[in-house]
């Protein structure tokens, strides 16, 4: 590719999916440029690596580019897209560019409705501990690496495979993981769940004859597609028929202790440095791959025991002063689907037994809130106190019956929690100051702008003091 393409431009370079690819390409020696609507830590990092960053979208930004990379979130009338089309500069979908990177190495693609980022991070960490030095492209910041992407010297590239727009069908990895299959992003599949499951089957058909599909048999929808997978299958999970499974699971001090049972191998005692049964499952996927690739048991144990997590995935901010003179434990999480939220809440209950759980939640997308409305009511009713914001639209038109206020009214009618509704994320710190008290566990949650709240909370409390 390099003899033809020397300069690659990214429209929306600050996004999690785009920035990782841009960083790997920059480290491979390509000239990288990009634009976004605002600066953030990611754009600053890319600039330090030599990328040319423009704030705002303008036709002039693509000057000199041999290819322009876009995601499905970029509109066709974007001025940079229009300029590329006018100049006959190739416009490349993000997943197609990721597929090009995978052609340079042996790809390990992590798919599933939930858990992709954490599982990708665990796989990358375990392979790194085993000396395989993988390249990785992750949808969140791997805390130990301080980045969401890295160019390694080894044979493997580990990356997330995105089913939300069916773009994972562009990838041709040698190992695939399917963590679970759930109803999300259903607009892509015509609101037909059978079409979604068929897409995952087609994803496995991208594997070569020597490849393998590593699948979580605890998920009933994954279990249903196994008979239709024609390539070798490795089953992992907590189920008795899992080939890589966890037994004797014990949650202690925010960690998960368990024994790994693998066919033809001695039992392996593991301590995972993060809470939650769902993370045990995610770790089992990494263990299955690492075992297949010859990583030692010692390296597996070390990587999982020292795993520092991923940004915004049950990310701990430590103790924050509460308005009553005490302090509460602050956690931030990206969860935005009821299934993910339930797993995070269960993990918090297990990690902090007996403590009051306060959730500040920003719903993400009106269509998701509409499609999962009753499930949101059910999961949000399981916390002890709730601050709820208006929906983060993500470019969608408002749906009055699926607004934050409508969700708040439904929760109040259900009678299990009395939500404090705030119109904007900017109001969350004030609301939490009134709700949170000494000894609480406070979780800020959502895929939108609420991710900026935790860093403001300490400053907010100090200003109020």
Swiss-Prot record:
Function statement: Cell wall formation.
Amino acids binding ATP: 112-118
Keyword Nucleotide-binding: yes
UniProt family annotation: Belongs to the MurCDEF family.
One GO term (biological process): peptidoglycan biosynthetic process
Gene Ontology CC, one term: cytoplasm
Cell compartment(s), UniProt: Cytoplasm
Reactions the enzyme catalyzes: UDP-N-acetyl-alpha-D-muramate + L-alanine + ATP = UDP-N-acetyl-alpha-D-muramoyl-L-alanine + ADP + phosphate + H(+)
Keywords, comma-separated and alphabetical: ATP-binding, Cell cycle, Cell division, Cell shape, Cell wall biogenesis/degradation, Cytoplasm, Ligase, Nucleotide-binding, Peptidoglycan synthesis
Keyword Membrane: no
Pathway listed: Cell wall biogenesis; peptidoglycan biosynthesis
EC number: 6.3.2.8
GO-annotated molecular function: ATP binding; UDP-N-acetylmuramate-L-alanine ligase activity
InterPro entries to which the protein is assigned, alphabetical: Mur-like_cat_sf, Mur_ligase_C, Mur_ligase_C_dom_sf, Mur_ligase_cen, Mur_ligase_N, MurCDEF_pg_biosynth, UDP-N-AcMur_Ala_ligase_MurC
Top-level taxon in the UniProt lineage: Bacteria
Pfam families in the record: Mur_ligase, Mur_ligase_C, Mur_ligase_M
Enzyme class: ligase
Name of the protein this chain belongs to: UDP-N-acetylmuramate--L-alanine ligase
């Amino acid at each position: 590719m390099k003899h033809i393409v020397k300069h690659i431009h990214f429209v929306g370079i600050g996004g999690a999916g785009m920035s990782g690819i841009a960083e790997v390409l920059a480290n491979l020696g390509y000239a990288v440029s990009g634009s976004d609507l605002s600066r953030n830590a990611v754009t600053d990092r890319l600039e330090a690596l030599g990328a040319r960053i423009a704030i705002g979208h303008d036709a002039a930004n693509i000057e000199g580019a041999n290819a322009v990379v876009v995601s499905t979130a970029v509109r066709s009338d974007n001025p940079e897209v229009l300029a590329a089309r006018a100049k006959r500069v190739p416009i490349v979908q993000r997943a197609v560019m990721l597929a090009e990177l995978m052609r340079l190495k042996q790809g390990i693609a992590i798919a599933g409705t939930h858990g992709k980022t954490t599982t990708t991070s665990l796989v990358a960490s375990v392979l790194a501990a085993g000396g395989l030095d993988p390249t990785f492209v992750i949808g969140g910041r791997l805390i130990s690496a301080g980045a969401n992407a890295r160019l390694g010297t080894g044979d493997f590239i580990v990356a997330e495979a995105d089913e939300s727009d069916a773009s994972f069908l562009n990838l041709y990895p040698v190992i695939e993981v399917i963590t679970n299959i759930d109803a999300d992003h259903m607009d892509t599949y015509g609101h037909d769940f059978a079409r979604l499951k068929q897409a995952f089957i087609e994803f496995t058909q991208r594997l070569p004859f020597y490849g393998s599909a590593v699948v979580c048999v605890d998920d009933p929808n994954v279990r249903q597609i196994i008979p239709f997978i024609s390539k070798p299958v490795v089953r992992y999970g907590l189920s008795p028929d899992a080939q890589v499974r966890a037994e004797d699971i014990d949650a202690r001090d925010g960690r998960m202790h368990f024994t790994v049972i693998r066919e033809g191998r001695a039992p392996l005692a593991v301590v995972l440095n993060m809470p939650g049964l769902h993370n045990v499952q995610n770790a089992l996927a990494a263990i299955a791959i690492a075992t297949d690739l010859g990583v030692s048991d010692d390296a597996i144990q070390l990587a999982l025991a020292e795993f520092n997590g991923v940004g915004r995935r049950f990310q701990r901010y430590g103790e924050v002063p509460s308005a009553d003179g005490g302090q509460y434990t602050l956690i931030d999480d990206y969860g935005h689907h009821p299934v993910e939220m339930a797993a995070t809440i269960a993990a918090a209950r297990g990690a902090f037994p007996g403590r009051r759980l306060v959730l500040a939640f920003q719903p993400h997308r009106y269509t998701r809130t509409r499609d999962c409305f009753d499930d949101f009511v059910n999961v949000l009713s399981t916390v002890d106190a709730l601050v709820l914001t208006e929906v983060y639209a993500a470019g969608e038109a408002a749906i009055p019956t699926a607004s934050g206020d409508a969700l708040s009214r439904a929760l109040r009618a259900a009678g299990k929690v009395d939500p404090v509704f705030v119109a904007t994320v900017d109001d969350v710190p004030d609301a939490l100051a009134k709700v949170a008290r000494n000894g609480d566990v406070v979780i800020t949650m959502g895929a939108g702008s609420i991710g900026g709240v935790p860093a403001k909370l300490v400053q907010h409390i100090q200003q109020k003091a």
